[in-house]
Amino acid sequence: MQDKYNHTEVERAAHAHWNANDAYRVTEDQAKPKFYACSMLPYPSGKLHMGHVRNYTINDMLTRSLRMKGHNVLMPMGWDAFGLPAENAALKNGVPPAQWTYDNIAYMKKQMQAMGLAIDWSREVATCDPDYYKWNQWLFLKMLDKGIAYRKTQVVNWDPVDQTVLANEQVIDGRGWRTGALVEKREIPGYYLKITDYAQELLDHVQIGNEKATLTGWPDKVRLMQENWIGKSAGVRFAFPHDIRNAAGERIQDGKLYVFTTRADTIMGVTFCAVAPEHPLAQHAAASNAPLAAFIEECKKGGTTEAELALKEKEGMPTGLFVTHPLTGEQVEVWVGNYVLMSYGDGAVMGVPAHDERDFAFALKYQLPIKQVVLVDGETFDFHQWQDWYGDKERGVTINSDNFSGLSYQDAVAAVAHALAEKGLGELKTTWRLRDWGISRQRYWGTPIPIIHCESCGAVPVPEKDLPVVLPQDLVPDGSGNPLAKCEAFLKVDCPCCGKPARRETDTMDTFVDSSWYFMRYCDPKNRDAMVAGGTDYWMRDQKAATGGSGMDQYIGGIEHAILHLLYARFWTKVMRDLGLVKVDEPFTKLLTQGMVLNHIYSRRTAKGAKDYFWPHDVEHVYDEAGKIVGAKLKNPAESGDGLLPVGTPIDYEGVGTMSKSKNNGVDPQQLIEKYGADTARLYTMFTAPPELTLEWNDAAVEGSYRFLRRVWNFGVKLSAIDKDAALASVAGAASLKDVQFGKEAKALRLEIHTVLKQVDYDYQRMQYNTVVSGAMKMINALEDFKATDSAGAQVALIEGFGILLRVLYPATPHIAHVLWDELGYAGTLGDLLDAAWPQVAPDALVQDELELMLQVNGKLRGAIRVAASADKAAIEQAALASEDFQKFAEGKAPKKVIIVPGRLVNVVV
């Protein structure tokens, strides 16, 4: 074997072996326990980033280690290939999105293969493949038939840059999740999926403390995020009667303004009502009120999510309309509020300024009445300053509430609900924050919605025999809306009902549809006759339940998908279950949300106020006296908006943040692999931090990982020079190891190796891969420190120890482990490392002939003594008093007492 570690040659040899043996192709095997582990499929943006490397290495370590432990493991990969970035890239480069997408897939696949990932590429899927999205269309039609999918017109989030509708979950702080553009409100028809029909089950399975919860293998943070998003609220829905009539003389909404509240105990404190800009009362008032109409138009510029509204300033305008308080008969003014959503509840809220912080601020701003109706003992109400106790329903008692005064929250709600019910104006009701999923997108590069619009027959589903409705592959967007709307070859079709000329639906499906079930398609990817089949039953089965339960054993991805993708995938799975396609209730048994990869961020404002970002390799830190980073400066000339900046130019240090192209703080995995090798990249990302925590990039630590692998290689070279045949034969069988005569040093080595192995095995089970690597480092230290190599027992201990190290390292650094395993002859006796058995802790190796005990004198550590493992108290005491360390630190004083902590220490009091 080569004397020096050459990562390029090592990795080439490993890949050749794996490719020749089709190493990672897997089939169903009922004789083995199955384990399905999957990373969230990537968008083919062009290149992998370090977050990908970390995610996929975590998955790879898991599947490789379990394969060694006898599991039938599946690690597939695919591409979330539809989406707006492809259209934008096509617009920029003048090429069809399909070409851009497939070119990127080819490059990123090569990068993944270079990483040595144990992916079964025979199961690869791309969501832009008609053979894949045919089943999106097929299931959509099944949902349409069952009433789960439907069409309606509704106020939606409109991204003015991407010219498309966004789901609520895709609006972050009032901006589009992809473009960052301020979202607008628009009324537009589209298709929706009734995820709300599954709200209770979605909540039950994820809710912490719920006896029906099944997702106990998910992080609590993710479970809580989903629970809050689903948002179950118990309260009272009631009406404010009115006699407001439209131009035809009819009462608007039958003369009732409905609201929902969880604080019915404060109903006697209502001083105004607020309605959404789209509410019928608002529209009626605006018809004869120009300033109000202008205000409503201004409101449409905001987004339609609670998160967006929570951040914006609360504004309103009176309508001049009044409704009647259902219990007091008082007239209550109706306002239009920019913070009220038509899509939530009835599009109206009651205003109780005294006991709602938002209403309090609104009332102060517009000088509206504030009426206190809840009192907390010992507190004083201030009409000019909000205090937290104003909204305290646990300690509060109702006041100024006529017959409802003196009641606790629970009693007041019950009494108010009863009074409203008697008047026919209200009832107890449960509401949900979750809204139906709008899947229509006014874009080209997505799954065509399989609907045909006929002037005679209306919206007609595409017949199943005509699926898939294939997306044209050669269109190039020009930036002016959806290209499908201008593609006559796609648009023109005969109505399947009447045969007359008709037009296809030009909206495409939200790309989150594609990612809601791809993990099931991996199980049976080539099936042209069914969406899922027997392979899905095998891989997506809960091994602890005959039916129901959860499917995939381990799912890995970022916490940024906690609401969007993960909630949709859960819903999609339940729909497929109800259609008889799968047997599980939930898609993912366990979820790991890996931490982000961080790096330093450096910037500088240009003369025009723009911000330039600089690559870390062009910058050096400036430190204060305490060694803290206080700034930075250029160590290489760098381009900026002000031209070429010279060495020494001061640069702002922004701390660490997620690696990002826009901030020039990313690390190219390809360059890392070329310089150090895939094993170094993998090892570094696993060693630096536990999988669930953030990883802060450190170039010096990358060098350290590379040096460690050189040490492992060099030790392998050392072993190659000795006669290993007899030792390998002994290591190959546990029984023959019992016949080996191990000397004192060899026993000590085996004790260290097997002690570390025991901990490493536990760490693998916990997926604490950083401490797995730490354990491997302890093993190489012990092997390097071992000097007695002249006996048969010593050689067996070395060969056994290094063989254990290679198997421990193999899931993390498979290339170097494979080559050393082969070169040193382990494959000939223990089999190919691909399927070599996981090393077992040898009980006899953990038996100690001697113990090392810490020696204290008057409670202070002064040294150590070694005694026989069988030594009794008298022998230990004698050894302690006779030791040089005791004699030195006792300073001639006689011992008064000897305290022995078995197996740990001896304390001599003088």
UniProtKB/Swiss-Prot annotation:
This is Leucine--tRNA ligase. Belongs to the class-I aminoacyl-tRNA synthetase family. A motif ('KMSKS' region) lies at residues 658-662. Pfam families: Anticodon_1, tRNA-synt_1, tRNA-synt_1_2, tRNA-synt_1g. It catalyses: tRNA(Leu) + L-leucine + ATP = L-leucyl-tRNA(Leu) + AMP + diphosphate. Keywords: Aminoacyl-tRNA synthetase, ATP-binding, Cytoplasm, Ligase, Nucleotide-binding, Protein biosynthesis. CDD domains: Anticodon_Ia_Leu_BEm, LeuRS_core. Its EC number is 6.1.1.4. One of its GO terms (cellular component) is cytosol. It is an enzyme of class 6 (ligase). The keyword Nucleotide-binding applies. GO terms for molecular function: aminoacyl-tRNA deacylase activity; ATP binding; leucine-tRNA ligase activity. One of its GO terms (biological process) is leucyl-tRNA aminoacylation. It comes from the Bacteria. InterPro entries: aa-tRNA-synth_I_CS (IPR001412), aa-tRNA-synth_Ia (IPR002300), Leu-tRNA-ligase (IPR002302), Leu_tRNA-synth_edit (IPR025709), M/V/L/I-tRNA-synth_anticd-bd (IPR013155), Methionyl/Leucyl_tRNA_Synth (IPR015413), Rossmann-like_a/b/a_fold (IPR014729), tRNAsynth_Ia_anticodon-bd (IPR009080). ATP binds at residue 661. Its main location: cytoplasm. Coiled coil: none annotated. A motif ('HIGH' region) lies at residues 42-52. It is found in: Cytoplasm. The lineage of its organism: Bacteria, Pseudomonadati, Pseudomonadota, Betaproteobacteria, Burkholderiales.
